[in-house]
Amino acid sequence: MKPFFSIIMACCDVEPYIREAVESVTKQSFGDWECICGIEESKDRTEELLREMAAADPRIRLFTHPRSGSCSATRNIGTDMARGEYVIFLDGDDTIAEESLARIHDMIAARPGADLYPCEIIAYTEGAEDKREIRENYPPDSSPEELTGTEATLLLQRLWNSNFCPMLQMTVFRREFLVEHDLKCIYGLRRQDSEFSPRALYLAKRVVPLHEPFYLYRLRSNSVSSAAKTAGHFLRDWAIINQSLFAFHAKVSRESGFDRRVSDCWARQGVSRFLYLWFYPQNIRAIPLERRLETLNILFSEGFHDFNLLLKSAGAGKRLAGVWVRGFVRYPALRGVAEFFFHCYFGLSEMKGKKKTSFSVLHSDTPADVKQM
């Protein structure tokens, strides 16, 4: 008999935290679950401790795989292995709140069959556990009880602009929905949530916010997500994310029934973020030209078609900026002029009183070595 929940846990070098993470599941009063732990090649006793706990509870299932530097492999393999009706993603240094599985089960039972059940997370910094912050994308006073994926996409843009939290851990997924759409994370990508979540949200037929603070998210300096903030990984990851999301828009925008407001929404989010990351004056000064060109060549390795298509839904200023982006990438002689244009572009935007683009939720998305300069 298949369990109600499949909890997929990414585990790599988390010896100090792994027992607490697993016990936050095993001590739940609701017991109809399986916990699938993906063990990346670790330098500490993570695997040893997990094998000890799995021997004591047959609901804990283990698999190992080579070190990849991200949670993508565990999440993909774990989804393939999962037998439960609903999937929860948990990191090996985080926990879930007491009695939360029972509460979520009852809420799902009251509104069964949705593809996504967004919840809340409780974020805290290691060493300052008494200072906690609840984060939610769908405030009860601003969100209907149920939405389509398109409605949810547009609502997040209206409520948060680009500042909604894309973390997979915030959402309970119907497993058959993930399988039906072959929703997978890009292998090795450290910011896979930012690429995966917009696609999953758009494809969902039913989204039911639960307003349940069930996930305890630990912010620590040596985590994978913190390592992803270094500029070397940072721009490469965002190049891959943008390339994928631009291509996804190009695909779904050709389908019958596509709501053109989604193009407007994604253009406001995606084009603004792209211009800021590669061409905001502070980033131009802080990130070497070679690194920006290297990652732009990754982003546009298949050409500019998908970018141009999304750009059509952007405002006139962003469309003009897109012309200079293409010139910057294609023609070395124009790079200095293009950078001067972007100094003027962002300067005028700020003079008009527009908010400087921000993509932070739990922490800044700008890498530390950029912010410090």
Q: Positions of the model-derived regions?
A:
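Short aromatic/hydrophobic "clamp" motif used to bind/position activated sugar donors
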Residues: 87
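Short, well-formed alpha-helical segments that are part of the catalytic scaffolds
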Residues: 13-27
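Glycine-rich, basic loop-to-helix element that forms the pyrophosphate-binding segment
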Residues: 65-82
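A conserved acidic beta->alpha catalytic loop
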Residues: 31, 39-49, 67-68, 96-97
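Short loop->beta transition adjacent to catalytic acidic/histidine clusters or analogous donor-positioning motifs
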Residues: 2-8, 26-37, 45, 57-61
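Membrane-interface aromatic/basic loop that binds lipid-linked glycans or pyrophosphate carriers
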Residues: 281-373
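Donor-binding/catalytic cores of nucleotide-activated saccharide
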Residues: 92-209, 215-233
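Catalytic core of nucleotide-sugar-dependent glycosyltransferases
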Residues: 213-221, 227-256, 273-306
